[in-house]
Amino acid sequence: MNSFDLIRVLCNTSPKAYALITGATVTGTMLAYSFEEGTIVVVEAQGLPATGCGLGVHGLHIHEGSSCSGTPENPFGNAGGHYSTTNCPHPYHTGDLPPLFSAIIVNSFSFTRSFAIS
């Protein structure tokens, strides 16, 4: 694998999965591409809050549920827990990805062999 292979995948293929990120102040998109025996994850987000100490650090992970919906009492109940095929604790879940840092617009690009999109 070299960086040109990754760029070729992003430019010449469609993502296998995507998610729209919507919240009161946060918006963005997550795209997932199949690559070799893993997944390329691309995130663009804006509106992530900072802290009084500077940039905010925000966890990024895949949930095992099918939607970020729920009930008034549990608004994200259908998202389920963090996706994990092992009994390892956070931050070693199968679906744990590098964190996002608050800024005007955040772009994150990562490759993982922890899971593959089919």
Give each language-model segment a name.
Residues 1-118:
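N-terminal leader/targeting pre-sequences
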